[in-house]
């Protein structure tokens, strides 16, 4: 039970220590939908899905937060950033902190983001991505590298794994609102990297970084909220505010 609790709380409690392992520095502003959630410090990632709304993980919830857009080097003001506060932070009504099911939330911005070459929205899915689809996960942090570029946005390309492989890696823990992506042999992983951050496949937001066991370990891939299953709630909620 102790190890189970550690697994489930890893992303939520240690979000500010998350790191991508085996990845590379993203081309500047190639992930212009990527945002940083800030509460005096960076604590989670997220994705801009319209000029007014950000998607993140429910386990990243804070009642009030600031969204930083247009970032690349998170500790340097590069002149491309926009800082916008939240007006509403809304967790999925069926989110479970016990098993991290339905791990998604929406953040309404107090003012619209200015869309430009540094900041733009990513599309929500109209269908689920197929197994083996290659996707990109992004986030800040790479402290397991000999060259620590963790303050610069990191990217990792990784495939969606089958439900069977995912369930075999985490028996009894994978729900219909989750999927696994990564490499069963280990060595490359988002490592919750940043919790709440995007998994983008062919230009569409298919995943939200959620949880996992360890970091880049064999047979323990990263687990992500399955946006295609949750997108109905996302669209309905955005339309009702």
From Swiss-Prot:
Sequence similarity: Belongs to the peptidase S1 family.
Subcellular location: Secreted, Extracellular space
Domain Peptidase S1: 20-239
GO cellular component: extracellular space
Entries under InterPro entries matching the protein: Peptidase_S1_PA, Peptidase_S1_PA_chymotrypsin, Peptidase_S1A, Serine_Proteases_S1, Trypsin_dom, TRYPSIN_HIS, TRYPSIN_SER
Keyword set, alphabetical order: Digestion, Disulfide bond, Hydrolase, Protease, Secreted, Serine protease, Signal, Zymogen
Proregion span(s): 14-19
GO biological process: digestion; proteolysis
Principal location: secreted
Record protein name field: Trypsin-10
EC number: 3.4.21.4
Lineage: Eukaryota, Metazoa, Chordata, Craniata, Vertebrata
Species for this entry: Gadus morhua
CDD domains: Tryp_SPc (cd00190)
